[in-house]
Amino acid sequence: MSKQDLIEMEGTVTESLPNAMFRVDLDNGFNVLAHISGKIRRNYIKILPGDRVKVELTPYDLTKGRITYRLRKK
């Protein structure tokens, strides 16, 4: 699967789960289970409940995703 097939959305982290998993409420109202991408994990970027994040979803399973970016707070 190429990067063109991925669906990228923004959302808010609502819950932190074990093993670097997070529950994210997307802007369109859906709720997904997301894990952290390797670059965020490698650079020790902390993600807390309430943070705005970018999530990549595959068209095959829209209930799971990957957090690729933590948006800055305004």
UniProtKB/Swiss-Prot annotation:
Domain S1-like: 1-72
Domain of life: Bacteria
Listed CDD domains: S1_IF1
Presence of the UniProt keyword Ribosomal protein in the record: no
Keywords: Cytoplasm, Initiation factor, Protein biosynthesis, RNA-binding, rRNA-binding
Cytoplasm found in the keyword field: yes
Chief location: cytoplasm
Molecular function terms from GO: ribosome binding; rRNA binding; translation initiation factor activity
Location in or out of the cell: Cytoplasm
Pfam family, one: eIF-1a
GO cellular component terms listed in the entry, alphabetical order: cytosol
Protein family per UniProt: Belongs to the IF-1 family.
Main function: One of the essential components for the initiation of protein synthesis. Stabilizes the binding of IF-2 and IF-3 on the 30S subunit to which N-formylmethionyl-tRNA(fMet) subsequently binds. Helps modulate mRNA selection, yielding the 30S pre-initiation complex (PIC). Upon addition of the 50S ribosomal subunit IF-1, IF-2 and IF-3 are released leaving the mature 70S translation initiation complex.
Assembly, per entry: Component of the 30S ribosomal translation pre-initiation complex which assembles on the 30S ribosome in the order IF-2 and IF-3, IF-1 and N-formylmethionyl-tRNA(fMet); mRNA recruitment can occur at any time during PIC assembly.
Name of protein: Translation initiation factor IF-1
Source organism (scientific name): Nostoc sp. (strain PCC 7120 / SAG 25.82 / UTEX 2576)
